[in-house]
Amino acid sequence: MGIKYGNLNVDEKYSKILEPNLYFDSILVPGVTYTDKYQTGPAGGIYVHKLDTTAVTVGTPGRDFTDEASSDTLIPILLNNNYMKSKKIYGVQAAAVDFDLANEQLSTATQEIKESRQQSALGCLVNEGTKSNGDAITANAVDAVLDEAAKIKKGKANVVLCSPDFYALVLKENGKDFTPAKNDEVAATGAIGDLYGFTWIRAAGLGEAEAKYYDSTGTLKTVALHKAATTSVDGSAVDFILYNSETLSIIDNLESFRIVDSENFTGSKAQAELNTGMKVTTPALARVRTHTIAKTGA
């Protein structure tokens, strides 16, 4: 479905700038690391699907069908995470801003929004996924991921978001083993590759202390990602998140994307505003591997 575009504050001349800058060099790519599928429900509400399945029992030919009710569940999602950026363009009125300058300023604004949106999504995955704490991983990184994959009973994980430290260990131990079609990109960027049916992605945001997002109830969540230990309290760190991309729903609504005259200084402003809803619809399909950092005191 992609991004929902409003029309009140969106200049169509510039709207094509948004998606390349929002998705380029991003860990959030629709259809790859999350799903953006949704449907509109009563009173204009936005709903995402959680599809549950049941096994088929073997029988003999010639038997009758046994009907069962659909187990498809619609889950409401609120577009309650707001990201906005306004960049000043001095000395030029909005009508006189050439396209290249508008492109530069709106692109920068979008990329800054992208970073915050990515961090929120990591917080959503860590907070709403299934936790799995263990010892610090210093060797056999791929084995640790495969161990978590075995715990996902139904459905198949296809994405591994790795902390910088964990991804470095993966590359040291298994860099030569990545699928050849993607191996050139791994060698060039050190950021993404395919191995054992998973897309492995370096998520730099997992090295940050925390992430914030508003959950589907409208509650602001502050999620610890890498909490340093103190002399009296243990710390913790996320090693990786293993999940099925269909279980992370992210819906975007472009609220504002425009060049407008400034009322405060001589010039104009490049403004971008995005409202986003995010939810892990099936927590069992998202495994969050963490380890404890021992306190430094005696």
Language model region names:
Residues 45, 159, 239, 267-269, ...:
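A residue-level signal for beta-strand positions that form part of recognition/binding surfaces
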Residues 89-156, 164-166, 289-298:
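Alpha-helical scaffold segments that mediate packing/assembly in large oligomeric complexes
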Residues 56-59, 169-172, 281:
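Short helix/loop capping segments that flank catalytic or ligand/cofactor-binding pockets
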Residues 71-95:
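Short acidic, glycine/tyrosine-flanked loop/strand segments centered on an H-E-D-like triad
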Residues 42, 150-252:
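Extended oligomerization regions of viral-like shell subunits
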Residues 246, 250-298:
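Extended, compositionally biased alpha-helical segments that mediate assembly or anchoring
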Residues 49-51, 163-165, 203, 273-275:
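Structured loops at beta-to-helix junctions and adjacent beta-edge loops in soluble globular domains
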Residues 1-75, 277, 295:
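N-terminal "assembly arms/tails" that initiate or stabilize quaternary assembly
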